[in-house]
């Protein structure tokens, strides 16, 4: 079934006229969406904790940030753009009791609403508008007259009026210039988590480390292993980004393409796909969400320890030195 996609003519900014939009959290998505909405003529207020770098950033962008509670109370449309792991507590402490009937509660990732960590009271519609790109790209494309495609989803029982508000919001941030795909909270949340865990983050990280370790353990120089298993990944990803698998294969050597066909299926096997299906089931059934919520309530000991350990892996250590040889890279360290 073909996706339903909305464009500029399908959305009307007048549905936000006379409404105050609160952006809660002035991070990557918050700063981009807030500025784009303001430039589109919408009335925007910012909820951000005083004393933080993002508070100062909002001030430098011409906003007058207030507390989360104050921004919620003052707004008609409230978009929660805070980190997933803190949303539920902040919702209970500062948002829930400051909502008024008829408000629209928004997010750009459905984790907390889909998994029941945020359960709005009766009379509050929920809405998701999710740009499919990082905040800096959402902002820069808007400024150039373009827009990053986005997703839109309505919560259970949400009205047609809320849908029109969502489309207006998407237009205000530039989404309808690229196209806004209709989805559901479940689909956005579950596919997002699956992609992160199986391919984009978990899958790629483990593939890179395993490839690097295999070469080093076989006696090859770690510098060579880094180039072949980490550094050159960007070249391939850029080709995929621009033209998909076919363009990538068109652009590489015939030797590399042949190796792709004969060796790829030996690495990603039927057993791998079966494990992917298990991961998807765990996401769908809420098992991953329960683990992540429990981890954070305990102070995130596993998460923090694993983060520290992963930074000591050989591919990370050798990369620090090699990237300093590449003056065209805007090197980042954490």
Swiss-Prot record:
GO terms for cellular component: cytosol. Mg(2+) 2 binds at residues 192, 228, 232. It catalyses: (2R)-2,3-dihydroxy-3-methylbutanoate + NADP(+) = (2S)-2-acetolactate + NADPH + H(+); (2R,3R)-2,3-dihydroxy-3-methylpentanoate + NADP(+) = (S)-2-ethyl-2-hydroxy-3-oxobutanoate + NADPH + H(+). Keywords: Amino-acid biosynthesis, Branched-chain amino acid biosynthesis, Magnesium, Metal-binding, NADP, Oxidoreductase. Pathway: Amino-acid biosynthesis; L-isoleucine biosynthesis; L-isoleucine from 2-oxobutanoate: step 2/4; Amino-acid biosynthesis; L-valine biosynthesis; L-valine from pyruvate: step 2/4. Binds 2 magnesium ions per subunit. The active site is at residue 109. Residues 184-329 form the KARI C-terminal knotted domain. Pfam families: KARI_C (PF01450), KARI_N (PF07991). Residues 3-183 form the KARI N-terminal Rossmann domain. GO terms for biological process: isoleucine biosynthetic process; L-valine biosynthetic process. Mg(2+) 1 binds at residues 192, 196. Its EC number is 1.1.1.86. One of its GO terms (molecular function) is magnesium ion binding. NADP(+) binds at residues 26-29, 49, 52, 84-87, 135. The keyword Oxidoreductase applies. Its cofactor is Mg(2+). Substrate binds at residue 253. Belongs to the ketol-acid reductoisomerase family. Involved in the biosynthesis of branched-chain amino acids (BCAA). Catalyzes an alkyl-migration followed by a ketol-acid reduction of (S)-2-acetolactate (S2AL) to yield (R)-2,3-dihydroxy-isovalerate. In the isomerase reaction, S2AL is rearranged via a Mg-dependent methyl migration to produce 3-hydroxy-3-methyl-2-ketobutyrate (HMKB). In the reductase reaction, this 2-ketoacid undergoes a metal-dependent reduction by NADPH to yield (R)-2,3-dihydroxy-isovalerate. This is Ketol-acid reductoisomerase (NADP(+)). The gene is ilvC.
């Amino acid at each position: 079934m073909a996706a339903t996609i909305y464009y500029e003519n399908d959305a009307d900014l007048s549905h936000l006229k006379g409404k105050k939009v609160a952006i809660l959290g002035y991070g990557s998505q918050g700063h981009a969406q807030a500025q784009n909405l303001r430039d589109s003529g919408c009335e925007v207020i910012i909820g951000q904790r005083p004393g933080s770098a993002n508070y100062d950033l909002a001030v430098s962008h011409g906003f007058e940030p207030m507390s989360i509670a104050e921004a919620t109370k003052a707004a008609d449309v409230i978009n929660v753009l805070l980190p997933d792991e803190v949303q539920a507590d902040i919702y209970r402490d500062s948002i829930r009791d400051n909502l008024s009937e008829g408000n629209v509660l928004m997010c750009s990732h459905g984790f907390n609403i889909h998994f029941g960590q945020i359960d709005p009271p009766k009379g509050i519609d929920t809405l998701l508008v999710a740009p499919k790109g990082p905040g800096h790209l959402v902002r820069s494309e808007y400024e150039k007259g373009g827009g990053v495609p986005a997703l839109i989803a309505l919560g259970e029982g949400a009205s047609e009026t809320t849908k029109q508000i969502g489309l207006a919001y998407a237009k205000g941030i530039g989404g309808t210039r690229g196209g806004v795909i209709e989805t559901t909270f479940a689909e956005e949340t579950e596919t997002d988590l699956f992609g992160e865990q199986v391919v984009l983050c978990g899958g790629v990280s483990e593939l890179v480390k395993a490839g690097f370790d295999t070469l080093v353990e076989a006696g090859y120089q770690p510098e060579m292993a880094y180039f072949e298993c980490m550094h050159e990944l960007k070249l391939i990803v850029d080709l995929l980004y621009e033209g998909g698998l076919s363009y990538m294969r068109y652009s590489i050597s015939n030797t590399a393409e042949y190796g792709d066909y004969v060796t790829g299926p030996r690495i990603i096997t039927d057993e791998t796909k079966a494990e992917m299906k298990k991961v998807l089931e765990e996401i769908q059934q809420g098992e991953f969400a329960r683990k992540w919520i429990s981890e954070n309530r305990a102070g995130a000991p596993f998460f923090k320890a694993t983060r520290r350990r992963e930074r000591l892996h050989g591919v990370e250590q050798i990369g620090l030195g090699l990237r300093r040889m590449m003056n065209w890279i805007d090197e980042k360290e954490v």
